[in-house]
Curated annotation (Swiss-Prot):
Pfam (any one): peroxidase
Native organism: Solanum lycopersicum (Tomato)
Gene3D superfamilies, alphabetized: 1.10.520.10, Peroxidase, domain 2
Function of the molecule: Removal of H(2)O(2), oxidation of toxic reductants, biosynthesis and degradation of lignin, suberization, auxin catabolism, response to environmental stresses such as wounding, pathogen attack and oxidative stress. These functions might be dependent on each isozyme/isoform in each plant tissue.
Residues binding Ca(2+) 1: 110, 113, 115, 117
Alphabetized GO MF terms: heme binding; lactoperoxidase activity; metal ion binding
Domain of life, per lineage: Eukaryota
UniProt-recorded name of the protein: Suberization-associated anionic peroxidase 2
Upper classification of the organism: Eukaryota, Viridiplantae, Streptophyta, Embryophyta, Tracheophyta
Amino acid sequence: MGFRLSLLSLAVSLVALALAGVAIYRNTYEAMIMNNGSLLQNISPDIDSLESGEVSILILNDKKKNSDKYLSQQLTQESCVFSAVKGVVDSAIDNETRMGASLIRLHFHDCFVDGCDGGILLDDINGTFTGEQNSPPNNNSVRGFEVIAQAKQSVVDSCPNISVSCADILAIAARDSLAKLGGQTYTVALGRSDATTANFSGAINQLPAPSDNLTVQIQKFSDKNFTVREMVALAGAHTVGFARCSTVCTSGNVNPAAQLQCNCSATLTDSDLQQLDTTPAVFDKVYYDNLNNNQGIMFSDQVLTGNTTTAGFVTTYSNNVTVFLEDFAAAMIKMGNLPPSAGAQLEIRDVCSRVNPTSVASM
């Protein structure tokens, strides 16, 4: 009898265990369904493990720390570059105020021909390479090359192991020149590359000329994706600096109504200079005031008042210098981001006036 009771007790225990197993399986299965098929386990506190959420947080924290560290290093490097260039530019303008306008113009003449690629900085090589410097719009006209060379060397000396293109340095120099002369500063993003060539004929065909009528000017700026308003704003760069008498005070280039303002010798030598407005060392709105009074020096400037749309922008800038300065800064950012020609061979030049030894300059 006792033996039978033992067997019955054992059978009941086995049934109970089986039922418990079914219950556990059912609860686990339901938990999986409720959690989109993911089995959530409670890990015993005496096991030296971390839950997946904690692991993810640690990974994200590590990534953020690495990202913050990289960003901090990048900002430090960029700050070094900006400081090195600014020191050279400020010194150059202190020595010669006109240099500020020259650096702004140099940047414009670089970017407007096949994008901001430093092509204008390449020296000619006798018999093998003719670049943009001696193209008619630039010959004996664009200047400031020595300042860019000094700024490049300053970056090399002050910011070791930082590779910055000559095109970037030129963009920074133009921005700092504008600020130095009283214009509105703006952000210059780094990352441009230097071309291994330049475009002699492109400088002739793409750059605006003093003799261009309004239709031609609008087309040239439209080709670079500038609006008419941006074109009129960028023309305001002529509120600072000088131009050669032989360029602006000759028939076809000069505004006939303002020709008497030309303070040039009878021979019109390249050393004779004509200021472009009455405050050539200050970035202001006087240029537009002069246009409204039909006293713009260059023909291409004065024709801006000959069209209802462009004349409206001239009046806007003449009436509100703040609007002009804001529009000019925005247009300079856009110009400074003009990309190099598709398929152009690019590098970061060691010396701005020549391609690296591994490259070969070509027309």
